[in-house]
């Protein structure tokens, strides 16, 4: 099953901050890059500067690292 924009997916990359979290596909690149699927999440990760709220809420994944829900 091909993943497309707007699909809800579960992350299956064990080293990812969002492992087993559900996100929404923001875009899928078809140019042949290694991690073509951009996934957006509700919560942010830990990459914000000290004392500043926020962080990243998107990340790139390969289709094999995602499971449609």
From Swiss-Prot:
A Gene Ontology annotation in the biological process aspect, one of them, is: photosynthesis
Which key words are in the record? Membrane, Photosynthesis, Photosystem I, Thylakoid
Compartments it resides in: Cellular thylakoid membrane
The membrane topology of this protein is: Peripheral membrane protein
Q: Name one Pfam family in it.
A: PSI_PsaE
The GO cellular component terms are:
photosystem I reaction center; plasma membrane-derived thylakoid membrane
UniProt family annotation:
Belongs to the PsaE family.
Query: What does this protein do, in the record's words?
Result: Stabilizes the interaction between PsaC and the PSI core, assists the docking of the ferredoxin to PSI and interacts with ferredoxin-NADP oxidoreductase.
The molecule here is called: Photosystem I reaction center subunit IV
Q: Highest lineage ranks of the organism?
A: Bacteria, Bacillati, Cyanobacteriota, Cyanophyceae, Synechococcales
């Amino acid at each position: 099953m091909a993943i497309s924009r707007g699909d809800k997916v579960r992350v299956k990359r064990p080293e990812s901050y969002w492992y087993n979290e559900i996100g929404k596909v923001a875009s899928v690149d078809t140019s042949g890059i290694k991690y073509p699927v951009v996934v957006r999440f509700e919560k942010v990760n830990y990459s914000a500067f000290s004392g500043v709220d926020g962080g990243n809420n998107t990340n790139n994944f390969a289709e094999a690292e995602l499971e449609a829900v």
